[in-house]
């Protein structure tokens, strides 16, 4: 009987020692120094951040304070041969491969508010597509040329969503087509052509402050105000150095930015004065990060200054056989010569992921 009691006491003491060790280990993780805890949590993706916030009160407060609400755009790549797509998150350097059979034969035209505008050149079919929810909103058919640009004002779920494109440019006239969501047909407007004769095509279209800004390949900027059905060509041109092989135009909180790219020179950053409608060269992006692609670009006032994602131009590149992104620092101290090669505009485009991404099935397939 004595030996049994002793063995039971030994087992209890062992269990107490084990439980005390586990508690010490648990307490060690909970009582991490504040700066170390924030450093660890700052490197977690949103999904793991939410999980970590359930550990204890201290972790919850740290996770919530560092949780990124305004996520960075993702880059979506389109296959030339099949219906496979690749989504790439540059902030976490993660990607996922997707298949959308319903988009077979379609090419991308524009991206805004988490939606893609897709066009089928064989059937002339237009549709809005959300790659995160797979929601699809069909539009009336419209013939489009290969290099024709199209844009829309906001998500198609809004009644104020407006599609815009220039369908024809002759010596005397320019034809514009617009379409409001839930309308029955396209609206056609014809204006006198005031563009210069060396005009070839529109390269960039941006919607801001209720107006569509349209940039031609020669640098002319035209405005279309849908509320007034008014078309105007501005007289000035942006300062452009010889040797430019492409440009990107975007907006941020009503301000219009234009970036000219060069093969063997650093980019030129310009900002439009909305009072005089003249372009002014800038040596900095003012803290913005511009995610640039040929058909549409995104801009964000990034908060990750300590990580270097600040005052940058983010571009899609091929590194070896891997698709990735590079950040080019735009400021007065930038002395590194940036070499950029123009890509096929229909290969990729930036898109904003939804804030409830964690609740979608797509989130669990990220690798």
From Swiss-Prot:
Residues 26-81 form the F-box domain. InterPro entries: F-box-like_dom_sf, F-box_dom, Gal_Oxase/kelch_b-propeller, KIB1-4_b-propeller. Coiled coil: none annotated. It comes from Arabidopsis thaliana (Mouse-ear cress). The lineage of its organism: Eukaryota, Viridiplantae, Streptophyta, Embryophyta, Tracheophyta. Residues 1-18 have a biased composition (Basic residues). It comes from the Eukaryota. This is F-box protein At3g56470. Residues 1-24 are annotated as: Disordered.
